[in-house]
Amino acid sequence: MDKLIKSIAKSGSFRAYVLDSTETVRTAQEEHQSLSSSTVALGRTLIANQILAANQKGDSKVTVKVIGDSSFGHIISVADTKGNVKGYIQNAGVDVKKTASGEVIVGPFMGNGQFVVITDYGTGNPYTSSTPLVSGEIGEDLAYYLTESEQTPSAVGLNVLLDEKDKVKVAGGFMLQVLPEASEEEITRYEKRIQEMPAISTLLESEDHIEALLKAIYGEEDYKVLVEEDLQFTCDCSRQRFEAALMTLSKSDLKEMKEEDHGAEIVCQFCGKKYQFKESDLEEMINDKA
Protein backbone atom coordinates (compact mmCIF):
# COMPACT_ATOMS: atom_id res chain seq x y z
CA MET A 1 0.00 0.00 0.00
CA ASP A 2 1.09 3.57 -0.64
CA LYS A 3 2.40 5.56 2.29
CA LEU A 4 3.29 9.02 3.52
CA ILE A 5 6.02 9.53 6.10
CA LYS A 6 6.09 12.65 8.24
CA SER A 7 9.48 13.56 9.64
CA ILE A 8 11.22 16.41 11.43
CA ALA A 9 14.87 17.44 11.73
CA LYS A 10 16.29 16.73 15.19
CA SER A 11 16.96 20.46 15.48
CA GLY A 12 13.23 21.14 15.06
CA SER A 13 14.00 23.57 12.26
CA PHE A 14 12.49 21.70 9.31
CA ARG A 15 9.84 19.12 8.62
CA ALA A 16 9.42 16.93 5.58
CA TYR A 17 6.78 14.66 4.09
CA VAL A 18 7.81 11.95 1.64
CA LEU A 19 5.29 9.90 -0.30
CA ASP A 20 4.99 6.74 -2.33
CA SER A 21 1.76 7.27 -4.31
CA THR A 22 2.30 4.67 -7.01
CA GLU A 23 -0.86 2.60 -6.47
CA THR A 24 -2.93 5.75 -5.95
CA VAL A 25 -1.98 7.13 -9.36
CA ARG A 26 -2.10 3.71 -11.02
CA THR A 27 -5.69 3.26 -9.83
CA ALA A 28 -6.61 6.74 -11.07
CA GLN A 29 -5.18 5.94 -14.50
CA GLU A 30 -7.15 2.70 -14.64
CA GLU A 31 -10.40 4.32 -13.50
CA HIS A 32 -10.19 7.17 -16.01
CA GLN A 33 -8.33 5.37 -18.82
CA SER A 34 -6.13 8.45 -19.02
CA LEU A 35 -3.32 8.84 -21.54
CA SER A 36 0.27 9.80 -20.73
CA SER A 37 0.25 13.58 -20.20
CA SER A 38 -3.16 13.54 -18.53
CA THR A 39 -2.05 10.74 -16.21
CA VAL A 40 1.02 12.66 -15.06
CA ALA A 41 -0.94 15.89 -14.52
CA LEU A 42 -3.71 14.13 -12.60
CA GLY A 43 -1.20 12.08 -10.63
CA ARG A 44 0.80 15.10 -9.54
CA THR A 45 -2.42 16.79 -8.42
CA LEU A 46 -3.44 13.75 -6.36
CA ILE A 47 -0.01 13.71 -4.68
CA ALA A 48 -0.23 17.46 -3.97
CA ASN A 49 -3.65 16.90 -2.42
CA GLN A 50 -2.35 14.05 -0.27
CA ILE A 51 0.32 16.41 1.09
CA LEU A 52 -2.18 19.17 1.87
CA ALA A 53 -4.62 16.77 3.54
CA ALA A 54 -1.82 15.35 5.69
CA ASN A 55 -1.37 18.87 7.09
CA GLN A 56 -4.91 18.82 8.50
CA LYS A 57 -6.42 17.23 11.60
CA GLY A 58 -9.73 15.65 12.59
CA ASP A 59 -12.25 14.92 9.85
CA SER A 60 -11.22 17.75 7.55
CA LYS A 61 -11.32 17.38 3.77
CA VAL A 62 -9.19 19.27 1.29
CA THR A 63 -10.22 19.93 -2.30
CA VAL A 64 -7.61 20.99 -4.85
CA LYS A 65 -8.72 22.58 -8.10
CA VAL A 66 -6.06 23.21 -10.72
CA ILE A 67 -7.91 25.46 -13.12
CA GLY A 68 -6.07 25.94 -16.39
CA ASP A 69 -6.99 27.41 -19.76
CA SER A 70 -5.23 24.88 -21.99
CA SER A 71 -5.69 21.27 -23.12
CA PHE A 72 -6.14 19.59 -19.72
CA GLY A 73 -9.00 21.83 -18.63
CA HIS A 74 -9.60 21.56 -14.89
CA ILE A 75 -8.18 18.95 -12.53
CA ILE A 76 -10.20 18.33 -9.36
CA SER A 77 -9.07 16.26 -6.38
CA VAL A 78 -10.50 15.64 -2.90
CA ALA A 79 -8.56 14.10 0.00
CA ASP A 80 -9.24 13.48 3.67
CA THR A 81 -7.06 13.09 6.75
CA LYS A 82 -7.36 9.29 6.63
CA GLY A 83 -5.24 8.94 3.48
CA ASN A 84 -8.13 8.67 1.00
CA VAL A 85 -8.00 10.66 -2.22
CA LYS A 86 -10.04 10.81 -5.42
CA GLY A 87 -9.79 12.99 -8.48
CA TYR A 88 -10.41 13.50 -12.16
CA ILE A 89 -9.12 15.52 -15.09
CA GLN A 90 -11.49 17.11 -17.60
CA ASN A 91 -9.51 15.93 -20.60
CA ALA A 92 -8.05 12.49 -19.91
CA GLY A 93 -6.92 12.09 -23.51
CA VAL A 94 -3.87 14.35 -23.72
CA ASP A 95 -0.98 12.24 -25.00
CA VAL A 96 2.04 14.34 -25.96
CA LYS A 97 5.41 12.93 -26.95
CA LYS A 98 8.02 12.85 -24.21
CA THR A 99 11.06 15.12 -24.14
CA ALA A 100 14.49 13.82 -25.12
CA SER A 101 15.11 12.89 -21.47
CA GLY A 102 11.88 10.89 -21.30
CA GLU A 103 9.89 13.42 -19.25
CA VAL A 104 6.19 13.79 -20.04
CA ILE A 105 5.25 17.37 -20.88
CA VAL A 106 2.67 18.90 -18.52
CA GLY A 107 3.03 22.66 -17.93
CA PRO A 108 2.16 24.01 -21.40
CA PHE A 109 -1.02 21.92 -21.46
CA MET A 110 -2.16 23.28 -18.09
CA GLY A 111 -1.77 26.85 -19.28
CA ASN A 112 -2.55 29.91 -17.20
CA GLY A 113 -4.94 29.75 -14.29
CA GLN A 114 -5.36 29.23 -10.57
CA PHE A 115 -4.30 26.74 -7.91
CA VAL A 116 -7.32 26.66 -5.61
CA VAL A 117 -7.48 24.95 -2.21
CA ILE A 118 -10.76 24.48 -0.32
CA THR A 119 -10.47 23.21 3.24
CA ASP A 120 -13.66 21.84 4.80
CA TYR A 121 -13.37 21.54 8.57
CA GLY A 122 -16.85 20.03 8.86
CA THR A 123 -18.31 23.22 10.33
CA GLY A 124 -20.29 24.19 7.24
CA ASN A 125 -17.95 27.07 6.42
CA PRO A 126 -15.18 25.80 4.12
CA TYR A 127 -12.16 28.05 3.68
CA THR A 128 -11.02 28.83 0.14
CA SER A 129 -7.66 30.27 -0.90
CA SER A 130 -5.85 30.40 -4.21
CA THR A 131 -2.71 31.52 -6.00
CA PRO A 132 -1.93 31.90 -9.71
CA LEU A 133 -0.34 28.98 -11.51
CA VAL A 134 3.36 29.73 -11.82
CA SER A 135 4.32 26.91 -14.20
CA GLY A 136 1.45 24.44 -14.49
CA GLU A 137 3.84 21.68 -13.41
CA ILE A 138 1.81 21.25 -10.16
CA GLY A 139 4.78 20.76 -7.82
CA GLU A 140 6.03 24.31 -8.32
CA ASP A 141 2.46 25.56 -8.07
CA LEU A 142 1.98 23.80 -4.72
CA ALA A 143 5.26 25.22 -3.39
CA TYR A 144 4.19 28.72 -4.44
CA TYR A 145 0.77 28.25 -2.82
CA LEU A 146 2.28 27.08 0.49
CA THR A 147 4.77 29.94 0.53
CA GLU A 148 2.38 32.71 -0.52
CA SER A 149 -1.01 31.66 0.81
CA GLU A 150 -0.03 29.76 3.95
CA GLN A 151 3.10 31.84 4.60
CA THR A 152 5.25 28.72 5.01
CA PRO A 153 8.42 28.65 2.87
CA SER A 154 8.36 25.26 1.16
CA ALA A 155 10.19 23.12 -1.37
CA VAL A 156 8.14 20.54 -3.26
CA GLY A 157 8.97 17.77 -5.72
CA LEU A 158 6.27 15.62 -7.34
CA ASN A 159 6.33 13.28 -10.31
CA VAL A 160 4.78 10.30 -12.03
CA LEU A 161 7.01 8.06 -14.14
CA LEU A 162 5.53 5.89 -16.88
CA ASP A 163 6.82 2.67 -18.41
CA GLU A 164 7.32 1.97 -22.09
CA LYS A 165 3.58 1.29 -22.44
CA ASP A 166 2.71 4.60 -20.73
CA LYS A 167 1.40 2.82 -17.64
CA VAL A 168 2.26 4.16 -14.19
CA LYS A 169 5.65 2.83 -13.13
CA VAL A 170 6.19 4.84 -9.96
CA ALA A 171 4.73 8.00 -8.41
CA GLY A 172 5.59 10.02 -5.36
CA GLY A 173 7.19 13.15 -4.03
CA PHE A 174 8.23 15.26 -1.09
CA MET A 175 7.52 18.50 0.73
CA LEU A 176 10.11 20.28 2.89
CA GLN A 177 9.02 23.19 5.08
CA VAL A 178 10.93 25.73 7.13
CA LEU A 179 9.77 25.96 10.76
CA PRO A 180 10.03 29.10 12.91
CA GLU A 181 13.01 27.68 14.84
CA ALA A 182 15.24 27.61 11.75
CA SER A 183 18.31 29.85 11.76
CA GLU A 184 19.54 31.68 8.68
CA GLU A 185 22.52 29.34 8.59
CA GLU A 186 20.26 26.27 8.61
CA ILE A 187 18.02 27.73 5.93
CA THR A 188 21.02 28.42 3.71
CA ARG A 189 22.31 24.88 4.23
CA TYR A 190 18.97 23.28 3.34
CA GLU A 191 18.46 25.56 0.35
CA LYS A 192 21.84 24.48 -1.01
CA ARG A 193 20.95 20.82 -0.46
CA ILE A 194 17.63 21.19 -2.28
CA GLN A 195 19.32 23.00 -5.17
CA GLU A 196 21.87 20.19 -5.49
CA MET A 197 19.32 17.41 -5.03
CA PRO A 198 19.01 14.92 -7.91
CA ALA A 199 15.92 15.33 -10.07
CA ILE A 200 12.77 13.95 -8.46
CA SER A 201 12.47 11.50 -11.36
CA THR A 202 15.95 10.15 -10.54
CA LEU A 203 15.07 9.70 -6.86
CA LEU A 204 11.82 7.92 -7.72
CA GLU A 205 13.79 5.50 -9.91
CA SER A 206 15.75 4.38 -6.81
CA GLU A 207 15.05 0.89 -5.49
CA ASP A 208 13.82 2.39 -2.19
CA HIS A 209 12.66 5.83 -3.26
CA ILE A 210 11.21 6.72 0.15
CA GLU A 211 14.65 6.26 1.71
CA ALA A 212 16.28 8.04 -1.24
CA LEU A 213 14.00 11.04 -0.76
CA LEU A 214 14.74 11.25 2.98
CA LYS A 215 18.48 10.95 2.32
CA ALA A 216 18.36 13.70 -0.30
CA ILE A 217 16.45 16.02 2.04
CA TYR A 218 18.37 15.51 5.27
CA GLY A 219 21.80 14.44 4.05
CA GLU A 220 23.88 13.40 7.07
CA GLU A 221 21.70 15.35 9.51
CA ASP A 222 19.62 13.53 12.09
CA TYR A 223 15.86 13.41 11.74
CA LYS A 224 12.95 11.73 13.45
CA VAL A 225 10.07 9.88 11.78
CA LEU A 226 6.88 11.18 13.38
CA VAL A 227 4.25 9.00 11.73
CA GLU A 228 3.66 6.74 8.74
CA GLU A 229 0.23 6.89 7.10
CA ASP A 230 -1.39 4.66 4.47
CA LEU A 231 -2.62 6.28 1.26
CA GLN A 232 -5.13 5.06 -1.33
CA PHE A 233 -7.36 6.18 -4.19
CA THR A 234 -10.89 5.68 -2.89
CA CYS A 235 -14.16 7.11 -4.17
CA ASP A 236 -16.98 7.52 -1.67
CA CYS A 237 -19.74 7.90 -4.25
CA SER A 238 -22.97 6.02 -3.64
CA ARG A 239 -26.40 5.48 -5.13
CA GLN A 240 -27.91 7.28 -2.15
CA ARG A 241 -25.81 10.38 -2.81
CA PHE A 242 -26.84 10.59 -6.47
CA GLU A 243 -30.46 9.88 -5.57
CA ALA A 244 -30.30 12.85 -3.22
CA ALA A 245 -28.89 14.93 -6.09
CA LEU A 246 -31.80 13.91 -8.33
CA MET A 247 -34.22 14.87 -5.58
CA THR A 248 -32.97 18.46 -5.80
CA LEU A 249 -34.45 18.66 -9.32
CA SER A 250 -37.92 20.08 -9.78
CA LYS A 251 -40.92 17.81 -10.17
CA SER A 252 -41.30 18.90 -13.80
CA ASP A 253 -37.66 18.08 -14.57
CA LEU A 254 -38.05 14.60 -13.09
CA LYS A 255 -41.24 14.05 -15.10
CA GLU A 256 -39.49 15.14 -18.29
CA MET A 257 -36.60 12.77 -17.56
CA LYS A 258 -39.02 9.91 -16.95
CA GLU A 259 -41.16 10.51 -20.04
CA GLU A 260 -38.42 11.38 -22.53
CA ASP A 261 -35.42 9.37 -21.31
CA HIS A 262 -37.34 6.59 -19.54
CA GLY A 263 -34.86 6.69 -16.70
CA ALA A 264 -31.53 8.25 -15.81
CA GLU A 265 -27.89 7.26 -15.81
CA ILE A 266 -25.45 9.16 -13.63
CA VAL A 267 -21.71 8.65 -14.00
CA CYS A 268 -19.41 9.58 -11.12
CA GLN A 269 -16.74 11.97 -12.42
CA PHE A 270 -14.23 10.81 -9.82
CA CYS A 271 -14.27 7.07 -10.53
CA GLY A 272 -16.43 6.48 -13.60
CA LYS A 273 -18.94 4.25 -11.81
CA LYS A 274 -22.40 4.29 -13.38
CA TYR A 275 -25.68 4.44 -11.47
CA GLN A 276 -28.94 3.52 -13.20
CA PHE A 277 -32.32 4.92 -12.16
CA LYS A 278 -35.34 3.28 -13.79
CA GLU A 279 -38.67 4.91 -14.63
CA SER A 280 -40.10 3.42 -11.46
CA ASP A 281 -37.32 5.05 -9.42
CA LEU A 282 -38.08 8.44 -10.94
CA GLU A 283 -41.80 7.91 -10.40
CA GLU A 284 -41.14 7.25 -6.72
CA MET A 285 -39.12 10.47 -6.48
CA ILE A 286 -41.93 12.40 -8.18
CA ASN A 287 -44.45 10.99 -5.72
CA ASP A 288 -42.19 11.88 -2.80
CA LYS A 289 -42.28 15.48 -3.98
CA ALA A 290 -46.09 15.53 -4.11
Curated annotation (Swiss-Prot):
CDD domains documented for this protein: Hsp33
Keyword Disulfide bond: yes
Keywords in alphabetical order: Chaperone, Cytoplasm, Disulfide bond, Redox-active center, Zinc
Disulphide connectivity of cysteines: C235-C237, C268-C271
Cell location: Cytoplasm
A single GO molecular function term of this UniProt record: unfolded protein binding
The record's account of how the chain is modified after translation: Under oxidizing conditions two disulfide bonds are formed involving the reactive cysteines. Under reducing conditions zinc is bound to the reactive cysteines and the protein is inactive.
InterPro entries per UniProt: Heat_shock_Hsp33, Heat_shock_Hsp33_C, Heat_shock_Hsp33_N
Its biological purpose: Redox regulated molecular chaperone. Protects both thermally unfolding and oxidatively damaged proteins from irreversible aggregation. Plays an important role in the bacterial defense system toward oxidative stress.
Stated name of the protein: 33 kDa chaperonin
